[in-house]
Amino acid sequence: MEIKVLHFVPQWPKQENAAVLFDLFLQKIGEEAEVHVATMSPVKESSGENFRKYCIGSGKADYGKHGIVNLLALQKRFLTLLYQLMPQVVHIHGSYHFINSRIALWSRKRGFPVVFSPYGGMNPEFIDQEYGMRTWKLLSYQKKMVRNASCTLISDPHEGDYIKEEKLSERIAFIEDPTKEEHTQLDDYADCTLQVYQKVLDTDMGKRIDRQSQEAVSALLHLSLAGDVERQPLCSEDILNLRSITPKKWRDIFLYAAEQGVTGYINDGIARAQLAVPETDAGTADHFPLRYPKDTRSLTSDKLLTPNLISRKAIERKLRHTRGAERTLCTMLHNLRYHVGQSSLSLRHLCDLYEVLRHTPLDEDALDIHLREQRIHTFTRRICQVLHEAAYLDEGFMPVAALDDKGTEKIRASLTKY
């Protein structure tokens, strides 16, 4: 599938050699991807051989504290272009430009992954030499861009060392600068850049998976967890949806399942549905480390995970009055609440809870009392709502009535927070 990329260059290179080289780079990228370039330089909007330029503002305009009107106008033009093109990746070029930080913020807040190329701007020697010309605020913007970017693309190893030492980001990709290294050709540079784009798209799949694929995941989890061999637990719409999934979406599903620790359940659901699924490279696909790694191990049911000693002792005192399956379930719920707070909640944890609720006999009256005493009754109602959405848990297996409110939304957000 062809990747669509929107490049943002605040100022078009003024030196002829640099401008020609950048044009060649964009053309090489355009041979394998759909490339669009936005700039603030007064260039005519034009279509090159493999890319198209757009002028969205004037580089001479004031965008500082006295230029709020200009900044709002620029934001409107950029967002109009962004939603018109709907790129898969936004690639920002250049260092120490206030507008770069705004472009990154506007893109990231709307769910578009951002790749940032500082071109030596994060080299500590450059920072020391140029700091007198840079305000502390501009340096802060620069560091924040690196911290929040889906990937920082560097060509200077000293930049990478500085970024790691400052603990700004672990999402770094190093590619030799073709203008400095004789053995690095422009073709290789473009190929490596495309690989970085794909690596970015293969990371944080929970943020990018579409609704059809999400519904397919829920159906497959339900099919695997229900364990009902006497009847088909899926409706005709779910079956039709599963049979209409494209190979590209199957790849996304397996990437998402790997992030959430439910690949085994997905494979079991596929086998039960007798689906013919194409082979994918999802198992070997390269990706960047997650900012909030998901705990893909089984949900602990025999001990509390809360590190706070006082809180743990208080919960343990209340658990003493709970026995058997009810005690196991209450412990799992306390640990689920801990994972939500740590942003490490995964579908694997919800699957473990689903199996207990579905296949373990529970005294619902006694359980209701225990949940209220331990102050997790409302949390349990919210978890039941999320389980109903994520794996189609039937109301008959819910120990309490489901609740959909702002607290439930926080649990959903924890699942997709990377």
Each PLM stretch: what is its role?
Residues 90-118, 122-123:
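An aromatic- and histidine-rich active-site surface loop
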Residues 113-115, 123-144:
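Nucleotide-sugar donor phosphate/pyrophosphate-binding loop at the beta->alpha transition
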Residues 175, 179, 183-209:
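C-terminal alpha-helical cap of glycosyltransferases
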Residues 49-77, 129-134:
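A short, charged, and often flexible helix/loop element on the N-terminal side
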Residues 24, 109, 135-151:
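Membrane-proximal helix-turn-helix segments that form the acceptor-binding/catalytic region
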